[in-house]
Amino acid sequence: MAVPEGAQPAVDDLDFDGALDIFWPVAGTSGAGLLAAGLPTRTPITFGALEGASGPMLVREIDAPDPYGALALEVLQIQNGELIAQSPDVSTLAPNKIGQAIYLKFIGKKDNRQGVGAVVEVRSGNVYRRIYWRGRSEVVGIGQQKWADVIRVTWPNGVVQQELDVEEGVAIMLDNPSFGEQPEGLIGSCPFLYTWNGETFEFISDVLGITPLGLPLAPGMLVPPDHDEYVLVRGDQLKVDANGELVMQFTEELREVTYLDRVRLDVIDHPEGTDIYPNERFAFPPFPEPHVHTVSRIAQPKKVTGSDGRDWTAELQGNDMHHPAPFERLAGQFLGLAEPHWLELEFDPADLAGAKLIRLVATGWFFWSDASVNVAAAGTPGIDFVPPTLEVQNADGQWVPAGPPLGFPAGKTKTMVIDITSMIPKGNPRFRISSTLELYWDSILLAVCDDDAEFKTTSLEPVSSDLWSRGFSEPIMPDRQDMPLFFDWSKTTEEPRWDQHPGLYTRYGAVDELLETIDDRYVIMGSGDALTLHFDATALPAVPEGYTRDYLVFLDGWAKDRDPNTYEALEVEPLPFHGMSGYPYRADESFPDSAEMQAWRKEWNTRPSHRWIVPLSTERETQWVREAISKLKASERGGR
């Protein structure tokens, strides 16, 4: 049977066998078509008489009051100028072969309310359906099976959810909102750093958050990446292991690719009673210059009031993981942003008396927004991305900015130190920090000492390194909104949420050579990769009497997520380089193509991307298993 010329066919699964059927209006009847039109077993059908029917044939699921009732389809057509509907009785056409079905409905939260753009896959035995979600409910046939083995949703932001053993007739979303609603969790921020603390590898923070590639603040307005960072690791977080080494793990666990060009460990011995902080924060050019702040005397706020009218003084006295939240966070497509808010801080003038230098010491964490959030905010009146700004009162009593935005901590949880000597009045040290970011401060203090404490630095290079395939750490879910999401190194999740960017990555094994100098010959890491770094602690001098030891990890590189609105987000290429004007770089710029760089590509970038998520279609699943076995044999890894 052929489709008549000029017919406007409709496509759906009329008999719920999991195969798509095609049908169209014909003269004298309401329709004709082919069951399982794409298979060799396709069967011609005709159904129902509707004299005078004309126009395109449309198909919709019947919205039954009881979603657990019989699932059915109806056909819509025009008859004598009126819209009419009929339910094709395909049981008379395919007796005893009507399959089971599942009613699907999803709610998007991060991208759009209807979930338009998601990809839904259903696997039941040998039945496989792949649906590009159009934002309405769907009735999906699963053949003669009594349940679907797995239903998987890949949301527009790339997050994958799946539900196993779903019984026929079940109304997904109505029965299980935890599956049917798009999750709002962390998808991209930056790679993670863990250090050996004597008992386990402790999560330190996300790192290289100052280096996002292709991140727009608004359409056409890109964030310039700052490619290097010093990360503070306290002495109690990094201990010498049984082999006399300091060991850390650098991992990529989100939907990102990392390009790591340099690693060094700076060991800082400083006087007891002083604290050290790197001069780091997420800011716009000019970027903060490398510097180690020393702090020996601080002033705590005597009173803190939020824009919500609440007294938040106790929450900002010290770092105790209790954070003020004087705002209503924005959910959905504006995740990471909040309503305009401020914290007003008052300090005792006596605490600042005699201070020649006053520095803001602010510790906190930021719920990372992403490219889609920024673009959505830029196009929505009243929604703005406003970094923290220090405000003081002018002569008229109005609160006005005392300078450019301060920036914000580029990770969880980090401290930024900023000289505000000329920004606040010493006689009345009262100021506000205003923002629209979902930013949680753990403490806001003033350093009222000189930045001149002596310290001694010993730099260590990695004595060995190992790039390997690990998987994804189990998240430690927070029990409060103001708590950041941490990760447990000792546990890996059995359900990866995303695959690696397509492209070529650095081969597994030792990569010391690529981390020695900043030369654009870097390590390329994908989701699920880990880099183990060993430093020789026996090369360190003893800690001088009256001193204590902390560490600064120096990193140089970039990170790129796969948000749909991130520029050049879909693949590993194009590769970043230090001489680029921005990312994406201009048409007259290109990655260096010297003989040395060509040799680097040929020798090191030999590992194809890995698909962590097992495909549901039988053909792709077989291919995935073959690839996995091949990679396992090639890696020759064992015992991890």
Regions found by a protein language model. Give the residues of each.
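Serine-hydrolase catalytic core recognition
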Residues: 135-137, 506-541, 545-547, 552-559, ...
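Beta-propeller blade termini
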Residues: 5-16, 20, 41-84, 91-92, ...
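Short beta-strand and adjacent turn/loop elements
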Residues: 360-368, 410-414, 437-439, 524-527, ...
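Surface-exposed loop/turn elements that mediate protein-protein interactions on large endomembrane-trafficking
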Residues: 1, 35-42
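Structural motif
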Residues: 29-37, 87-93
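Gly/Ser/Thr/Pro-enriched helix-cap/hinge segments flanking short amphipathic alpha-helices
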Residues: 55, 66-72, 79-317, 324-358, ...
